[in-house]
Amino acid sequence: MAQPGTSASSSSAVSFETALLLLATLTAFAANSILCRLALAGGHIDALTFTSVRLLSGAVVLTLVLVAKSRQPVIAIDPPAMLALMVYALAFSVSYIGLAAGVGALLLFGAVQVTMLSVGLYRGERLSAQAWFGFALAVAGLVTYLLPGKASAPMGAVAAMLLAGCAWGVYSLRGARGQDPVAATTSNFLAAAPLTVALAVIFGSGWHITTEGMVLAALSGGLTSGLGYVLWYHVVKKIPALTAATVQLSVPILAAFGGVVILGEPLTSRLAFAGVAVLGGIALVVKGRQGTVAAASAKPAQQSGAVVREQWIYGAGI
């Protein structure tokens, strides 16, 4: 993968083909929430089995992609990343037993970004006033949605999705260290899948499996996760860095739209307010961090790569 800081200039135009691929990728990420909600809320499969099938099918598709590119899959296991992937995938599944698709996607997105930004601050990253304001706005949006009330979501499901977001934030930061994200993602899927299956065998006393549930889980793992990741890692090399970070804001919106149209879920004023606050806040953070990095005098290219790469890796998580 090309260095993020040099993959596309901030002024370069995005071709029509790239725009279509980008739209397909973002739709795939949003579809993960729809497929999971369809499978679990509909009672077609239990969460542990769904997670196992999702990771297995993702591992198969990612391996086939590497083989098709005449590359020998090499398993280079990163234990913390593998564990984070497992926690993310399982918590993601559990949460959608009780969360609407749009709500889950928004909580996941917010938790990932807050986790990654918090780690950045701990490591000494400095934010502009605009980025700080955006961070506070995003956190306020999440807190506002989580306040008790008639429209509040089940707290157990909310906690599971926040855990999934924190885990994916950790996975993203681990992935930011590598140079070949497709190979790294394949390795982590190959390592996590059998362990998750083992957990399902050991602890899955409440198995509930239907053909429809298996198909939905396989689509989530192989199509919207596996192929979605490959498309994302391909398309980010062709678009400006700020665009790559910003377009991810559309994923929760697409998921909420899909939930309303496909699943018949309500779009509440509470969710709309939280969505505007969280997505608007993250947009300010992205823009503010970009400006801070561009203005830095010490090793600007490396700093830009570190910030942008984290944003790019996250895109594979929804």
What is each residue range found by the language model?
Residues 2-5, 55, 147, 249-318:
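C-terminal-most transmembrane helix of multi-pass membrane proteins
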